């Protein structure tokens, strides 16, 4: 299979290949690019596994994936794109938000780890634009809007799910109280 055909190229997208903003996040520019993104995915899985259910992790990843696709399409200056880093940013940010927003009234280790991860993501996003493409292993530029979009998408998807879940739990509890009165 020619994986290069899955990379987002703006003109190919405009010519009707609507799937490219999504498939581009499954392919990479080089083997080191794959390794860095793969290592990030393994780290996130290992980091979140003891603390979170799969739902919030998948929602963070999905939110990042969709948000990256939207920003790649919306940005006329983005001529090409490949890589999972934006979607991984969504997974990281969404998972960290889920940890910070965990049920319970006290700030336990899970919440502090989630807050620390959110702060590290902000630091990374502040430092990364200061690096040039040659500073990176794969020699391709980092498309910062994808990282920002992925972060926002992960936060939005997990945040909306968390608020919806909390609201439905409160409604069920109110319903049960009303039923027993």
What are these regions (language model features)?
Residues 34, 59, 108-119, 145-148:
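Alpha-helical transmembrane segments of integral membrane proteins
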Residues 40, 59, 63, 67, ...:
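Hydrophobic faces of alpha-helical transmembrane segments in multi-pass integral membrane proteins
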Residues 51-56, 79, 100-105, 165-172:
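Membrane-interfacial segments
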Residues 26, 123-181:
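C-terminal transmembrane module of polytopic alpha-helical membrane proteins
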Residues 20, 44-45, 101, 109-110, ...:
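Intrinsic low-complexity, intrinsically disordered segments enriched in polar/basic residues
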Residues 65, 83-131:
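Multi-pass alpha-helical transmembrane bundles in non-GPCR membrane proteins
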Residues 1-59, 66-82, 139-146:
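N-terminal TM1-TM2 helical hairpin plus the immediately adjacent luminal interfacial "cap"
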